[in-house]
Design a protein with these regions (language model features):
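An N-terminally biased module of ancient metal coordination in phosphate/nucleic-acid-related enzymes
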Residues: 1-84, 94, 158, 163-167, ...
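Active-site gating/metal-coordination segments in enzymes
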Residues: 67-113, 127-128
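Domain-core and long-helix interface of multi-subunit machines
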Residues: 12, 96-97, 104-221
C-alpha cells in the first residue's frame, strides 16, 4: 500500500510527529510513504511550514528514513501551493531542495479584488471560479514543476456537476502525459461536506471527490 500525501504537525492543521506518522503507517502495512507537509508560502502562513522549520523538517525525514529503512520506504516531499502570479516564488523555493516528490495544489483562486479559497464551498461553484480553477490546473501542469496534482477534484465540494468537471478536465489529460504528471487519488472528500446549490446548505455523507467518472479514463490513458 502507498500513501503519497500526508501531513504532520509541521502543517499546523494536522497532529503527530513525523516519526509517529511513520510508526502508524508501518502498523497499517503501508510500504511506501511520502511525507508532504505544506511548504512555506506568501499567504495562509498559519497552516504550513515556516521557512526556518524546513531544516528541521528535512532532518526529521532523514532520521526516520534511516531508522525504519527495513520496514518502510519513506520519501521526502512537500505540498506546494500553485498560484500563477507567484510562480517565481515557488521556483526559487524549491530550486535547491533535493526532493523525491512534489505535489502542486490549488488552494487559492485570485481575482482582481478577491481571493477565493478552495474550502469556501459556497463560492466555488460560480462559473468564473470554475473557469479560473481549470486555467490554474492547466498552468500547473504546463509548469512541469510537479510530480502530482494535489486533490484536483476538490472543487466538486462546491456542488458542481461531475459531468462538468469531467468535460473540463478531459483536455488536460494529454498535457499530463506530456509533462509526466500524476493525478492524485485523494479520498479526503469522502469525509468532507458538500455544498448544495439548490438549498444553500452543506451536507455530509455525500460523495464529492474523487471524481468517479474520470478514474477509468485516467487509467485507460495510463495516468497514474
Amino acid at each position: 500500500m502507498i500513501d503519497s500525501h500526508i501531513h504532520s504537525y509541521y502543517s499546523k492543521h494536522a497532529i503527530g510527529t513525523i516519526e509517529e506518522i511513520v510508526v502508524s503507517a508501518i502498523e497499517k502495512n503501508i510500504k511506501y510513504l511520502t511525507i508532504t507537509d505544506h511548504a512555506p508560502f506568501l499567504i495562509d502562513k498559519n497552516n504550513r511550514l515556516q521557512d526556518y522549520e524546513l531544516k528541521y523538517y528535512f532532518e526529521d525525514i532523514n532520521t526516520v528514513q534511516s531508522k525504519y529503512s527495513k520496514d518502510i520506504t519513506i520519501l521526502k516531499g512537500l505540498e506546494v501551493d500553485f498560484v500563477p502570479k507567484y510562480i517565481s516564488y515557488t521556483e526559487n523555493l524549491i530550486s535547491d531542495m533535493n526532493l523525491d516528490f512534489l505535489i502542486g495544489s490549488i488552494h487559492f483562486i485570485f481575482f482582481e479584488n478577491e481571493r477565493i479559497n478552495i474550502w469556501d464551498i459556497h463560492k466555488i461553484h460560480d462559473e468564473k471560479v470554475v473557469s479560473k480553477y481549470f486555467l490554474y490546473l492547466k498552468e500547473l501542469i504546463l509548469s512541469g514543476l510537479f510530480d502530482s496534482i494535489g486533490h484536483p477534484d476538490a472543487i466538486l465540494r462546491g456542488g458542481i456537476d461531475e459531468k462538468i468537471y469531467y468535460e473540463k478536465f478531459f483536455p488536460l489529460i494529454k498535457l499530463m502525459k506530456l509533462k509526466n504528471t500524476s493525478y492524485e487519488l485523494n479520498t479526503s472528500g469522502l469525509r468532507k461536506s458538500t455544498y448544495d446549490i439548490n438549498t444553500n446548505s452543506e451536507n455530509n455523507g455525500i460523495w464529492n471527490y474523487p471524481c468517479k467518472s474520470l478514474l477509468s479514463t485516467l487509467n485507460n490513458n495510463n495516468i497514474s
